């Protein structure tokens, strides 16, 4: 009987299941660590790029300076990226320390990743909308495109938004992985 349980991946003599260290579980752990690190790196880079986005132009001998902090959507993006970056660092530490494969950890990780994903998605959407109007204008509302005058600022803002979107995609993948593990473990939400 004991040999049958060992062949099935369980060891009753030790009272320990080998399923927690099986290759699929280890693959999940590695993918999770890599995606959390990428989320941390991309949102950190997005913050750095957006905060340094500044340009001064002269119109009719009057000097104007454009900064990310003048636009509420860009401030929201930086704030959301800071929250996502910080909590990604904490979750990376949490996952590394508490890698036990317990299903209740999957639920907390799922919930954590879901909240961060929604926050990131809303900030990216707001910044993308403002960036689109800045680049192309809105003729029917008589809003002029301004990126022709502040090209460097607009390019940096675009780069920051793209980096934030990559961070969002990493969070989306983490959410799917955590939901899948909840389902596989039999602890559906």
Curated annotation (Swiss-Prot):
GO-annotated cellular components: plasma membrane
Keyword Cell division included in the entry's annotation: no
Transmembrane stretches, start-end: 28-48, 78-98, 114-134, 157-177
Membrane side Cytoplasmic: residue ranges: 1-27, 99-113, 178-189
Domain of life: Eukaryota
Keyword Transmembrane helix annotated: yes
Record topology, Extracellular segments: 49-77, 135-156
Coiled coil: none
Subcellular location: Cell membrane
Family annotation (Pfam families): CASP_dom
Keyword terms, alphabetized: Cell membrane, Membrane, Transmembrane, Transmembrane helix
Membrane topology per record: Multi-pass membrane protein
PANTHER family, sorted: CASP-LIKE PROTEIN 1U1 (PTHR36488:SF8)
Family: Belongs to the Casparian strip membrane proteins (CASP) family.
Quaternary structure note: Homodimer and heterodimers.
Protein name in UniProt: CASP-like protein 1F2
Native source species: Vitis vinifera
């Amino acid at each position: 009987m004991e040999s049958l349980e060992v062949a099935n991946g369980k060891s009753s003599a030790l009272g320990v299941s080998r399923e927690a260290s099986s290759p699929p579980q280890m693959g999940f752990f590695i993918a999770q660590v890599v995606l959390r690190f990428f989320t941390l790196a991309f949102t950190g880079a997005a913050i750095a790029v957006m905060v340094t986005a500044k340009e001064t132009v002269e119109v009719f001998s009057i000097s104007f300076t454009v900064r990310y902090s003048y636009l509420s959507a860009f401030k929201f993006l930086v704030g959301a990226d800071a929250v996502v970056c910080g909590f990604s660092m904490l979750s990376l530490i949490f996952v590394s320390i508490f890698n036990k494969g317990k299903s209740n950890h999957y639920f907390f990780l799922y919930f954590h990743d879901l909240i961060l994903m929604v926050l990131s998605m809303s900030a990216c959407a707001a910044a993308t909308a403002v960036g689109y109007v800045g680049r192309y204008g809105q003729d029917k509302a008589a809003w002029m495109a301004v990126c022709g005058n502040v090209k460097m600022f607009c390019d940096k803002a675009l780069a920051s938004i793209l980096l934030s979107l990559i961070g969002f995609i990493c969070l989306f993948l983490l959410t799917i992985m955590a939901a899948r593990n909840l389902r596989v473990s039999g602890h559906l939400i």
